[in-house]
């Protein structure tokens, strides 16, 4: 499973996106409980190449729709903004995402600089979790017109309360 994951990641980095996605999906079929966290990587990949229908299917799949990990909630926020813009639904997604990890906003908006290395361990809700997510997901976020500016506006309002 780890070898197949490594292959999927290498294929992605070499620009062979369809082959990479196929490997990610294969891993999830072989291991639907996904103790490797492959769904998080797959979701970011789908967002990065704007396969939003496929991303929506993954996020809402019966296996993972109730996932409350920060990576999942922040990627749900991205999709909600793509689909609905600054809507009540998107604002609810933002609230849930901030509750899961409020550090994400600072790194996604550039208020804090992301080091170019991954942490050795991840603390749920911690800055290290935020840094790792942003290292993987920033390209997807930057491809959505207005999303980072919207996040900056929404979270700066929260800071002033």
Could you say what each language-model-derived stretch is?
Residues 3, 10, 43-45, 79-83:
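Residue-level signature for tetratricopeptide repeat
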Residues 26-47, 106:
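Short, charge-rich amphipathic alpha-helical segments embedded
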Residues 47-58, 66-74:
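Active-site-proximal binding-pocket segments
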Residues 1-15, 33, 39, 95-100, ...:
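Short coil/linker segments at helix-helix boundaries
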Residues 14, 49, 83-84:
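Structural motif corresponding to the intra-repeat A-B loop/turn of tetratricopeptide repeats
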Residues 25-32, 59-68, 94-103, 137-139:
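Solenoid-like repeat scaffolds
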Residues 78-161:
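Long, ordered, amphipathic alpha-helical scaffolds
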